[in-house]
Every structure is written in C-alpha cells, then in structure tokens.
Amino acid sequence: PKTACPTSGPFKPVRIIGKGHNPEMFRAKDRRYVVYVIDGRYVSDDLNGKWEYGKFDFNARDRRIIEGLSNLSFAQREDSSYVMVCRGGGIWVSRDGLSEYNQLTDRRVYPDVDGRFEDPVIWRDHIQYHLIVNDWLGRIAFYLRSKDGVNWVVDPGEAYMPGVAVHADGQAEDWFKYERLKVYQDKYGRAIQANFAVIDTLKNEDKPFDHHSSKNISIPLNPGLLLTILDEKPITSGTKTIRVKIQAEEGFNPQTDIDVNSLRFGASEEVNYGRGCQVLTTENAGKDLIVTFNGKGNG
C-alpha cells in the first residue's frame, strides 16, 4: 500500500512536563499515558493534564541484567499485559505496563555478533512482534521478529544503515549516523513511519555554533500487505496448494497494483532468498485478490 509520513510535522513545543533522556510514550492497560525516560516515568490521564513522575519496579528473578536498565522500549501483548526490552537485550513483562516488570530471559536476544548495541525498539502488529536494535559503533541496525515476544528470529541483512534517506526524486540526505529509532503504527499495528535522530558527524565533533547539526527526520515505510490464508488445514511440506487472500486497502488495489508473477509465498528463510511457492492462479473476490500458490517449497 502507498504511504506517506502521516505525522511529519512541522511540530512545535507546547509545554515541558519534566526532565528526561531517551523518552518513549505508550498507553498502559488502564489507558493512561506513560512517558518513559531513563531511570523514571511520567504518567497522566490526559496529554494536556498533570503529569506525575515516578519509577518502574523491576524483578530480575535471579537473572543477570545486561548493561543496566536503560533505553527501554515497550509493547502491549495480546492479553493486555506488556513486554519490554532493555538496552542489553533482556525481555521483561508487566501485568499492566505500570506494575512490576519481571525478567524472563537469561541472555540477550540480539544477534550473536560483536556489536555495541543500544536503542532497541519493540512493537507488535496483528501478526507478530518486531524488534530493531542499533549497533552504534558499526552504524548498522538489525531486525528481529517473534511470535511470542520472548523467542526471537534474526532476519538476514540490515534493518537500516547510512544512506537510507532518499527522496522520491532521488535526492539523498547524507547523514553520518542514524539513532533513536521510533515507529508510528497504523490501526493494525504495522509500522508505517520511522522517526530517527540523525547527525552529520561524530557526536563529539558537533561543537556549538559550528556547521554540524543533529535533526529528527521521518521516513515513510512500506507497511506490507494484509494477507489471510484461506486453507483450514495447517501448511506442511506435503501441502499441494495454498490459497491466500490479499486485502484491498485505501490507495492499494491488489488486482491492478501487483506484479503477480513476482509473488512468492513461504517461510522467510525461503522467500528472502528468492525461493518459495510460485503462483498457479488468481481470482478476484470483490476488491480483494485470491492467489493460489503451488505448495512446493513453502519451507
């Protein structure tokens, strides 16, 4: 589906609720607004109301806390509880987003590489959980996905790296480093906009009154497609055909906007490398498109 940055501004400050670093906002189970900052949180019933400062409680449950409890990121789970990832890559859960967070993992969930990880961001859509973490020294980020928010799969390749900010007319923005990623989600939970803190040099070379600068930039994201598997039986290696409905959306007509012959279906480990199931037939269903794939090679 086509998308543009829906919240790209311009913005202006309207009030200061307090001090803090590396904030992230979410809504707790009781629908109150929560602004996390390192070593604390602000809570309010109303964005324009009174904000109360406090601290989260943490229970490591005899597990090692990796790199301290900072740069936290939060997502609501299917049962309305909350999952949190800390800078070190530990996974924590809370009953309602404000009550005690308990650590579930005893090791980091990040890729098994020698990275200097920070600024994780976690979110959930209608299918699964997503996590992106930045290697600040290597200036590269990694993408992970999970069905339960605890056990994660690292997808190959880079989530982002310098050079990703390119306009539709081909003009590129030459930022040295991208950090502090946050995502804006649609009603399905899909990430449709990425917000970055960017800078055009090393941080310690950005001096007062010089020509260097840090900015917040927004980049629209492809949200992916709304897919429904129509078959009632689970997919196995012996499945002969797979029927998938591609749902129409505002600004997207699957019957005209898709190169059907380019479609592949299957496990990410297959499709990401150009393999997977190939299209056999298609049929229109109202505004939607139903695609029948050969089941061979689904992974």
Please name every model-derived segment:
Residues 1-228:
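Carbohydrate-active catalytic/glycan-binding domains of CAZyme proteins
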Residues 246-254:
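Short amphipathic, basic-aromatic surface patches that mediate peripheral association
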Residues 271-299:
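Structured beta-strand segments within beta-sheet-rich domains
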Residues 224-245:
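Boundary/junction segments of secreted and surface-exposed precursor proteins
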Residues 99-101, 253-256:
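Propeptides and adjacent flexible N-terminal/non-core segments of secreted
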Residues 74, 230-235, 276-283:
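Short amphipathic beta-strand and strand-loop transition segments with alternating hydrophobic
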Residues 138, 255-260:
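Short coil-to-beta strand junction motifs in C2/discoidin
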